[in-house]
């Protein structure tokens, strides 16, 4: 095998910015910061973000009311 051909692997602490969860991975990068991890992502937890869904409902109701006023 050739020397200095393969990248160096590091043990990296990955930090979730949302829930502050930390876990360790092996990578060629020295640092990771992620927005959402499996501990706080809605797909994995089964929880929906109420604020986001409420905002979408309000937006739909405003468009519907605007359409009714035009008639």
UniProtKB/Swiss-Prot annotation:
<dbReference type="InterPro" id="IPR002150">
    <property type="entry name" value="Ribosomal_bL31"/>
</dbReference>
<keyword id="KW-0699">rRNA-binding</keyword>
<comment type="subunit">
    <text>Part of the 50S ribosomal subunit.</text>
</comment>
<dbReference type="InterPro" id="IPR034704">
    <property type="entry name" value="Ribosomal_bL28/bL31-like_sf"/>
</dbReference>
<dbReference type="GO" id="GO:0019843">
    <property type="term" value="F:rRNA binding"/>
</dbReference>
<dbReference type="GO" id="GO:0003735">
    <property type="term" value="F:structural constituent of ribosome"/>
</dbReference>
<dbReference type="InterPro" id="IPR042105">
    <property type="entry name" value="Ribosomal_bL31_sf"/>
</dbReference>
<keyword id="KW-0687">Ribonucleoprotein</keyword>
<dbReference type="GO" id="GO:0005840">
    <property type="term" value="C:ribosome"/>
</dbReference>
<keyword id="KW-0689">Ribosomal protein</keyword>
<dbReference type="GO" id="GO:1990904">
    <property type="term" value="C:ribonucleoprotein complex"/>
</dbReference>
<comment type="similarity">
    <text>Belongs to the bacterial ribosomal protein bL31 family. Type A subfamily.</text>
</comment>
<protein>
    <recommendedName>
        <fullName>Large ribosomal subunit protein bL31</fullName>
    </recommendedName>
</protein>
<keyword id="KW-0694">RNA-binding</keyword>
<comment type="function">
    <text>Binds the 23S rRNA.</text>
</comment>
<dbReference type="Pfam" id="PF01197">
    <property type="entry name" value="Ribosomal_L31"/>
</dbReference>
<dbReference type="GO" id="GO:0006412">
    <property type="term" value="P:translation"/>
</dbReference>
